[in-house]
């Protein structure tokens, strides 16, 4: 049996909800059956953090429960990115129209989310959905 996950946006609340879903899958021994993940917004941030906490590999059930989930919780609860992004935005107005770049830079510095998508394991397949602000498409 293969499992496909469609994880929605909604910022950090969505990310935390998705962590609960993944915890349930890990507790049931199902992480290895996840074959495709589709994410948008907060879910994409959540997945990036999960991969960053596991050397760009999809975690096994044990890895997720014992190492990845605690590391992700620590990042979310102890390494605030919103405050640092806002502070940097006001100290460096250059980023005013480049907020996505600013968020990426802060996530790299505070949460160690870095690297290239090509470095991520190919299984499960990960589809990152987005909308262009300029066109709405």
Residue spans for each PLM region:
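Patatin-like phospholipase
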Residues: 2-6, 11-102
């Amino acid at each position: 049996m293969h499992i496909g996950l469609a994880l929605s946006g909604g910022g950090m609340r969505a990310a935390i909800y998705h962590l609960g879903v993944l915890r349930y899958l890990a507790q049931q021994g199902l992480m290895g059956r996840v074959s495709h993940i589709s994410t948008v917004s907060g879910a994409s941030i959540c997945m990036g953090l999960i991969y960053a906490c596991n050397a760009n590999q999809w975690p096994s059930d044990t890895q997720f429960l014992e190492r990845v989930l605690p590391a992700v919780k620590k990042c979310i609860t102890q390494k605030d990115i919103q405050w640092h992004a806002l502070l940097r935005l006001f100290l460096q107005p250059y980023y005013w129209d480049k907020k996505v770049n600013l968020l990426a830079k802060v996530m790299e510095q505070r949460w160690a989310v870095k690297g290239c998508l090509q470095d991520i394991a190919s299984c499960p397949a990960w589809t990152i959905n987005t909308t262009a602000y300029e066109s709405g498409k």
